[in-house]
Amino acid sequence: MHGKVPTLQEVILELAPQTEIDLQCNEQLDSSEDEDEDEIDHLLERPQQARQAEQHKCYLIHVPCCKCELVVQLDIQSTKEELRVVQQLLMGALTVTCPLCASSK
């Protein structure tokens, strides 16, 4: 470059073909049924794990202590259906006691 701004004449483009690359692979793979089965099992596990992660979510439930009315926090991992069962139990006769009241008996 001889000036402040490059000109098209100063830019030299040389396009030369690269040497040809041999795309043939001379490697041989051992066909192992165990590896194939492991790969299939791994592929089947992933969707199942994803489904379990979707089904079992973490829920925080705040329930008053049955003796002192202090709020107790319950961390529950369950499906929505199981959470409904817990909700029905808490709305019924099931009561929760805070650690202070439980230790004082």
Curated annotation (Swiss-Prot):
A motif (LXCXE motif) lies at residues 23-27. GO terms for cellular component: host cell cytoplasm; host cell nucleus. Pfam families: E7. Homodimer. Homooligomer. Interacts with host RB1; this interaction induces dissociation of RB1-E2F1 complex thereby disrupting RB1 activity. Interacts with host EP300; this interaction represses EP300 transcriptional activity. Interacts with protein E2; this interaction inhibits E7 oncogenic activity. Interacts with host TMEM173/STING; this interaction impairs the ability of TMEM173/STING to sense cytosolic DNA and promote the production of type I interferon (IFN-alpha and IFN-beta). Residues 1-45 are annotated as: E7 terminal domain. Keywords: Activator, DNA-binding, Early protein, G1/S host cell cycle checkpoint dysregulation by virus, Host cytoplasm, Host nucleus, Host-virus interaction, Inhibition of host innate immune response by virus, Inhibition of host interferon signaling pathway by virus, Interferon antiviral system evasion, Metal-binding, Modulation of host cell cycle by virus, Oncogene, Transcription, Transcription regulation, Viral immunoevasion, Zinc, Zinc-finger. Its main location: host cell. The gene is E7. Plays a role in viral genome replication by driving entry of quiescent cells into the cell cycle. Stimulation of progression from G1 to S phase allows the virus to efficiently use the cellular DNA replicating machinery to achieve viral genome replication. E7 protein has both transforming and trans-activating activities. Induces the disassembly of the E2F1 transcription factor from RB1, with subsequent transcriptional activation of E2F1-regulated S-phase genes. Interferes with host histone deacetylation mediated by HDAC1 and HDAC2, leading to transcription activation. It is found in: Host cytoplasm; Host nucleus. A motif (Nuclear export signal) lies at residues 83-91. Highly phosphorylated. A zinc finger (unnamed) spans 65-101. InterPro entries: Papilloma_E7. One of its GO terms (molecular function) is zinc ion binding. This is Protein E7. Belongs to the papillomaviridae E7 protein family. The E7 terminal domain is an intrinsically disordered domain, whose flexibility and conformational transitions confer target adaptability to the oncoprotein. It allows adaptation to a variety of protein targets and exposes the PEST degradation sequence that regulates its turnover in the cell. One of its GO terms (biological process) is symbiont-mediated suppression of host type I interferon-mediated signaling pathway.
